[in-house]
Amino acid sequence: QLTSATGPDGLEIRREYDELGRLIQETAPDGDITRYRYDNPHSDLPCATEDATGSRKTMTWSRYGQLLSFTDCSGYVTRYDHDRFGQMTAVHREEGLSQYRAYDSRGQLIAVKDTQGHETRYEYNIAGDLTAVIAPDGSRNGTQYDAWGKAICTTQGGLTRSMEYDAAGRVIRLTSENGSHTTFRYDVLDRLIQETGFDGRTQRYHHDLTGKLIRSEDEGLVTHWHYDEADRLTHRTVNGETAERWRYDERGWLTDISHISEGHRVAVYYGYDEKGRLTGERQTVHHPQTEALLWQHETRHAYNAQGLANRCIPDSLPAVEWLTYGSGYLAGMKLGDTPLVEYTRDRLHRETLRSFGRYELTTAYTPAGQLQSQHLNSLL
């Protein structure tokens, strides 16, 4: 069993198992730990998980390994029904929200119905390819296939798009809804080498022996792409002049990217913590001749104890901070010590009230979970 895996950047994933060989703990590269609990010594399926935030989720299973219920960290329960073939026939969520599924004798999904009785139907050909989706309002989207099962024609909203293939099964011609054409050419290794678009513009692509793109041509613009020994993109040139550069640290993390704009070198530098999380971005503009620094702006990022991003600190501005709960649902934001917005949510974590400044936005939903209304009110 896999107990650890270390990536090129030195970050490690670790796993622990019980005496029965079941996964009981997993440590992510950023140090976050997820624990797994089992209530049956004969089952390989966990009855509960607990993540680094302390959020606990529970599951129940049938004796055939089918998920019967899932309870999230807020106590919200989703239940599942299955038929004798193991196919899911219904999903029951909180607030009376349910979805029902029907299948044909071949086990293909043929209908999905919501709580209000709105039904979406599906049709197939004899080979089992999906040929039509009929929405509750009766609108129909269809797909036609050739003898090899490749889509040759799709119709959506009354508009049709068609595809042609070569003997190797590659798309060589695409006809859009307005009758315009795009054509494609490939090399013997199935790599795209030429594309002529709807507007008649032709783009060509060249690859090295390992499949990396090394040259592209677009209406007189010739771009060369360059890589290091780790196959990371290091720079590209356009018509012989450097256009962009990428640099990395010893862990392989991107440290900066730069390009030339109106003669000035514009760069963005990135900083990370030991867990690989982005901690800072610094943008700079340098003089074209002297390389003197003309302008810079830095933004820092911070994380809470659970590893969730919770602060953004721009230069010369108060920090922007957001408050979350559970698995990261947004509860509010503030600028410095000034509240910007607060959210109230229902049991399904849907926004029901948004308070910002002197205003409140209330949101209501139908029994089927669809947006029903929104009202903006002034508190004055």
Language model features by range: what are they?
Residues 1-7, 11-28, 32-72, 76-93, ...:
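Beta-strand elements of repeat-based all-beta scaffolds
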